[in-house]
Amino acid sequence: FLPVVAGLAAKVLPSIICAVTKKC
């Protein structure tokens, strides 16, 4: 379960950071 969540977070976090900070 945790590795799946970690993998998902690794995919989603950059796009969230990109959207929030406008740094891509």
Curated annotation (Swiss-Prot):
Name one cellular component (GO) term: extracellular region
Where is this protein chiefly located? Answer: secreted
Q: Name the residues that span the membrane.
A: none
Short name of any one Pfam family annotated for the protein: Antimicrobial_1
Keywords attached to this Swiss-Prot or TrEMBL record, sorted alphabetically, are: Amphibian defense peptide, Antibiotic, Antimicrobial, Disulfide bond, Secreted
Listed as disulfide-bonded, the cysteine pairs are C18-C24
One of its GO biological process terms is: defense response to bacterium
What is known about the tissue distribution of this protein? Expressed by the skin glands.
Q: Where in the cell is it found?
A: Secreted
| Protein family according to the UniProt entry | Belongs to the frog skin active peptide (FSAP) family. Brevinin subfamily.
Provide the function of this protein. Antibacterial activity against Gram-positive bacterium S.aureus and Gram-negative bacterium E.coli.
Name of the featured protein: Brevinin-1SY
Native species: Lithobates sylvaticus
Q: What is the lineage of its organism?
A: Eukaryota, Metazoa, Chordata, Craniata, Vertebrata
